[in-house]
Amino acid sequence: FCFMTYPIQLHGQSFQMHFSGALFWVEKSMLLISDVHLGKISHFRKYGAAVPQQAIQQNFDTLNTVVEFFKPKGITFMGDLFHSSLNSEWALFEEWVHSITSEIILVSGNHDIISPLKYENIHIKVISELVIDSFLLTHHPEERDGFFNFSGHIHPAIKLTGLGRQSVRLPCFYKTQSQMILPAFGEFTGIYTLEPCNGCEVFALLGDSVLPVPIKEVKRKPNTRK
């Protein structure tokens, strides 16, 4: 079975995984989104890459879709919101921020080099990590005793193999006992295939669906370095 959203319980809290790659925390009415990489498409186009102009708008259309679906009180971007320095997409982002009512927090990532003052001017709080109850929200995956960690950065994907050795790699939510790595939300962000570990749970994104993936027993843990 596959679904537009897929529910999961973590530390007694309810979450909904969305096919866009966003994760909704029900009790907090908070949307978690990682690795949008706004500005990346404009950056590529500037240097001659054949990326269609409409791809820029796609990121904002997807953001609008998921915000309208969940109507969150808060949105936490978990790093790499912007891919590089300021470009024309910043103005589009400002317009988008002013069009919604959700409170926005940015947990900064390695690509977030734009001055925090620019974010503060549009009422976005920039922090290095966010702790809420027994949950730790970071950009890079972290292990911290007593906490369940939500992170991004890896752009996780799973390789699915079918008949005739045909295979496909799909972005996914990747969950271990103490972590969940969110898929990259943005267009043209790339993916990094992880080898599932014993006890892991994987939820692949396929079109407008979230698909739970059965995991076979394996002997090695994934390399989550990138």
Where are the regions that the model predicts?
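Extended recognition/assembly regions associated with phosphoester-bond processing machinery
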Residues: 1-78, 82-226
